[in-house]
């Protein structure tokens, strides 16, 4: 499965799987 860090919410077909911290910003880890 593929995961990516997104700023904001995950899309419907993706599931929230954690958080990413990039340059002090919090992103959502979204996997599908």
From Swiss-Prot:
Has antibacterial activity against the Gram-negative bacterium E.coli and the Gram-positive bacteria L.monocytogenes and S.aureus. Has antifungal activity against C.albicans. The keyword Hydrolase does not apply. Disulfide bonds join 3-31, 5-20, 10-30. PROSITE patterns: DEFENSIN. It holds the Pfam family Defensin_1. One of its GO terms (biological process) is killing of cells of another organism. GO terms for cellular component: extracellular region. SMART domains: DEFSN. Keywords: Antibiotic, Antimicrobial, Defensin, Disulfide bond, Fungicide, Secreted. It is found in: Secreted. InterPro entries: Alpha-defensin_C (IPR006081), Beta/alpha-defensin_C (IPR006080). This is Defensin-3. It comes from Papio hamadryas (Hamadryas baboon). Belongs to the alpha-defensin family.
């Amino acid at each position: 499965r593929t995961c990516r860090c997104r700023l904001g919410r995950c899309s419907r077909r993706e599931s929230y799987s954690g958080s990413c911290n990039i340059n002090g910003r919090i992103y959502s880890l979204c996997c599908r």
